[in-house]
UniProtKB/Swiss-Prot annotation:
It comes from the Archaea. It catalyses: 5-amino-1-(5-phospho-D-ribosyl)imidazole-4-carboxylate + L-aspartate + ATP = (2S)-2-[5-amino-1-(5-phospho-beta-D-ribosyl)imidazole-4-carboxamido]succinate + ADP + phosphate + 2 H(+). This is Phosphoribosylaminoimidazole-succinocarboxamide synthase. CDD domains: SAICAR_synt_PurC (cd01415). Pfam families: SAICAR_synt. One of its GO terms (biological process) is 'de novo' IMP biosynthetic process. InterPro entries: SAICAR_synt/ADE2_N (IPR028923), SAICAR_synt_PurC (IPR033934), SAICAR_synth (IPR001636), SAICAR_synthetase (IPR050089), SAICAR_synthetase_CS (IPR018236). It comes from Methanopyrus kandleri (strain AV19 / DSM 6324 / JCM 9639 / NBRC 100938). HAMAP family: SAICAR_synth (MF_00137). SUPFAM superfamilies: SAICAR synthase-like (SSF56104). It is an enzyme of class 6 (ligase).
Length: 247
């Protein structure tokens, strides 16, 4: 597929105009990997392919469950076609187990199960370090309406339920994950961005070893091996996507 003008370049993805439809974009997954707000950076050859294929599969799972996303179709192993969204400047985090920043700022035990899950909203800003915000902050900054925030929370919990069950069959624990949302051309709040080892904590169900970006954050070994293991499990039964995996 041809791609048009570069619209946006993020830490690990690039968005291009769609060659035929102004309401669509082509999202390309690069091999860049970052952590700690760009304090740690590297390039891992093939990582973008794993993230693209995993995201495509998980978006398809959500769409099959009736959860609206920006996903339209897979273009190739690195690119997908998505709806053009008016994005909220927010990140929504859903936590099923206590780990990461949660245990650093609150008295939870590492690995503690959270039932019901905890949902947090962060202001998406490298300058301010993505601080957690509540409805008062969101309202004062004009980031979203109360109805939009409630819809994002509702969708996040639905995503959690659907993906937790799907990943259980892949012998993966969905520890926590980050979502981004936007409004599509029809005025609907939908899940955007990606759902991948870059934005989720995936733990092996038996060993609780990381199959995600924590391998890079914590220097725990071969990042690509973890992403590949996650991809092979998540894409099980999807021969078309499995055939696109590197190597």
């Amino acid at each position: 597929m041809e791609r048009g003008r570069l619209v946006y370049e993020g830490k690990a993805k690039s968005l291009y105009e769609h060659p035929e439809d102004e309401n669509l974009l082509v999202m390309e997954f690069r091999d860049d990997i970052t952590a700690f707000n760009m304090e740690k950076m590297d390039t891992v050859e093939g990582k973008g392919v794993y993230n693209c294929l995993i995201s495509a599969r998980l978006f398809e799972v959500l769409e099959d469950a009736g959860i609206p996303t920006h996903y339209v179709e897979l273009a190739d192993e690195r690119r997908m076609v998505v709806e053009r969204l008016d994005m909220f400047n927010l990140e929504v985090i859903c936590r099923n187990m206590a780990t990461g920043s949660l245990v650093e700022r609150l008295p939870f035990e590492e690995g503690e199960k959270l039932d019901p899950p905890i949902v947090e909203f962060d202001y998406k800003s490298d300058e301010y370090g993505d601080p957690m915000v509540n409805m008062d902050h969101i309202r004062a900054l004009g980031l979203a309406t109360e109805e939009e925030v409630e819809r994002m929370r509702e969708l996040t919990l639905q995503v959690n339920e659907v993906l937790s069950e799907f990943l259980k069959d892949c012998d993966i624990i969905l520890v926590d994950f980050k979502l981004e949302f936007g409004v599509n051309p029809d005025g609907e709040v939908v899940v955007g961005d990606e759902i991948s080892p870059d934005t989720c904590r995936f733990w092996d169900a038996e060993t609780e070893e990381s199959l995600d970006k924590d391998i890079f954050r914590k220097d725990e070994g071969d990042v690509l091996a973890g992403y590949r293991e996650a991809a092979e499990r998540i894409l099980r039964g999807d021969e078309e996507k499995l055939a696109m995996l590197p190597g």
